[in-house]
Regions:
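Alpha-helical solenoid repeat scaffolds of the TPR/TPR-like class and their adjacent stem/linker regions
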Residues: 1-236
């Protein structure tokens, strides 16, 4: 069995630590394909600030080694995804700007690849992930429009495009009506027999739900919930 076949089998079995050891011990010169596998294996095995840094370095090396090939493009798309994931991993509470360098590099590489490869919906969606984390709203809307013009929006990305237009005044009420109606084309039809009947039974319990992307101990909603639970009198 060749080393590449062995790596493939290990990857299918998700034995990532063995892949990392095998590549680091057997490959003195690593191709873009091997660098891609190595970096993916690192991130699949463990997530940390240093692991992200090392994996991003390997994705970058793979891209720079062969910018014009599919392997190079794959490495770049992995770089964009990992850079966005790193920013999410560190969270808003991180003030070191550690991820900012990788986000800025992502923009540079994205523009470069777009000029080289032309329209690529997967590349654009990953670019949008980066632009969101850099708060580049106008750029986000430009690329969502490109996807719309090519009929490459799905339900999730279509609703995201509508949502981000709320922060601008480009659309009027007719535009919102027009595009929200188009959502019907992306919503699956659910047969009646698969629908769940909602209970109409009433009781004295009050049920309250809160939805937030970042509820934590210092979040304002947490203090609100504490006061509700502490002082609520169900007899009144």
């Amino acid at each position: 069995m060749t080393i590449k076949k062995e790596i493939k089998n290990l990857f299918l079995q998700k034995r990532f630590s063995e892949i990392i050891f095998l590549i680091e011990s057997k490959f003195e010169e690593k191709t873009p394909e091997i660098l891609n596998i190595l970096a993916i294996s690192r991130l699949s095995q463990q997530r940390s600030r240093e692991i992200y840094k090392q994996s991003l370095s390997e994705f970058e090396e793979a891209y720079l080694k062969d910018k014009n090939s599919q392997d190079g493009l794959n490495a770049l798309m992995n770089y964009l995804n990992a850079a966005a994931d790193l920013d999410d991993y560190l969270g808003h509470q991180d003030t070191s700007n550690f991820s900012k360098f990788f986000l800025d590099q992502s923009v540079k590489f994205f523009k470069e690849a777009e000029n080289k490869f032309g329209y690529n919906p997967k590349l654009i969606l990953l670019g949008i992930r980066i632009f969101k984390r850099l708060n580049q709203l106008d750029t986000i809307l430009i690329y969502y429009k490109k996807l719309f013009d090519k009929n490459d929006l799905n339900l999730l990305t279509f609703t995201s495009w509508i949502f981000f237009n709320n922060y601008k005044t480009y659309w009027n009420q007719k535009d919102y009506f027009k595009f929200t109606k188009l959502l019907d084309l992306h919503i699956p039809n659910i047969p009646n027999e698969k629908l769940i009947n909602l209970s109409k039974k009433k009781n004295d319990k009050i049920k309250i739900g809160f939805l937030s992307s970042d509820i934590n101990k210092s979040h304002s909603i947490t203090f609100f919930l504490k006061t509700i639970c502490a002082y609520y009198n169900k007899k009144e």
